[in-house]
């Protein structure tokens, strides 16, 4: 059994995916070769063994990725975090964090003026037109308050990920 923090497990999954992509690439590069000439095989035993080794590595990495992702998921749905006196699962906090970041980004994009989005324009036949967001001050205050919540939740998740331990039976480590 291997013990890892959630942070280490997430990092390991990322590394395993990179290694998996390298194994996939071998099938497009070094394993994609002429295999027969005039109906006679020209594959050497060494390359055939390399292909078998790659397939074995792929299976081991697949196992480890699934095992780690399942263990992280389990810890996220059972691990608890306290925010403003209320208790939430890490999974709930992660989901709210994802949604709140999306809200902040979308509202910021829609309240920003600049390139191709001028606040003041001269419109022929109308005059000087000023554009803005209705209740802009309220929207900007909402964004600012939500950013504070997002940052606080992010720090709690970082702490959770760096202190919570999972155990997993891994084949590649």
Residue ranges and their predicted role:
Residues 1-173:
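Structural preference for solvent-exposed beta-strand-turn elements
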